[in-house]
Amino acid sequence: LYEHRAELDDVLAHEIEVMHKRIADTKKIPAKEYAEYSRLTAEAYSVYVKAKNTNDFALFEPYLTKIVDFCRKQTVWLADEHAHGYDVLLDMYEPHYTREKYDRFFDALRTRLVPVVRRVTAKIAPVPAWATQNFPADKQRDFCEYLRDVMCFDKTRGIMKESEHPFTSGFGTDDVRITNHYYEDNIASSIFSVIHETGHATYEQQCDRSLNCTLSGGGASLGMHESQSRFYENVIGRSKAFWQAHYGKLQQTFPQQLDDVTLDEFVAYVNRSERSFVRTEADELTYPLHIMLRYEIEQKLIDGSLAVKDLPAYWNEKFTEYFGITPPTDTLGVLQDVHWAYGNFGYFPTYALGSAIASQLFAAM
């Protein structure tokens, strides 16, 4: 069938091509090593959560070391004439996107962004006192459910719960699951997390139902998927027009905290640019730098030029170089993201790609 795919319709031909590659790649990975790796990543998540919550990188280090070792082996097992080294991992998440393409993309961003970030964030006003008040989690949950519904998430075909790190998952267009996390001293975090994840979810729910249970389902690519979440989060969610419609509801939910805060003050706050330690809470201007940091680190981990034991120190060094501030803890530094606990090396660059696509979509509208 693979040899005759040119005679098939586009959807079936694509399905056959993807299936053929996955089967071929799977056969290249030793079964025993893959089974051990599956057990390792299953255990690594709970260890990662504990390490993050206790600021204890040493607890997670042996697990991450083994995960990186396996990913390095993957780049050897799965190498072909089109991809080798880190390119093998990049291709898993955004097919045909290589280091060469990402390097051109990030080099252009780095040249223009780093000096702008330094200049803009040097003048930023301090966080207003109202933004650090106590916003009870149950009330945040109520408002985030309101936003989820406003943005047309179909509750008959999905659900929203809580997790340590917000994410979207599911099993086709009729079973889409999103999670959120609530910090009682940071109302913006949960708001923009739920808008972001609802962007993923509504894209997923609107995919062609005929592609359910196929390898073509779930969206065109991770970069395109991320463009939808970033479009919702930044283009829609940070606009004054959006909050003209919904700020009154937020004030009703938190009258004590927000009654004296004007719409313009709130919109200015959620659009402020500052050097933040946490990627998921970064503004549009500084967000790409967070991704570039991870992109550079992943390459060094995979090519062996950076040892896992040296990761926290290297993270802080590069973070200081890009942002001019140093993470005070590993929880706010190298331990902030769950991706590496799952072995998702090569995933982070799709976030920056998605942001660029979202901006291009908006510019074309």
Q: For each predicted feature, which ranges?
A:
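N-terminal helix-rich structural modules
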Residues: 1-65
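C-terminal substrate/ligand-recognition segments
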Residues: 343-363
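Active-site metal-coordination segments of metallo-dependent hydrolases
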Residues: 214-226, 286, 345-351
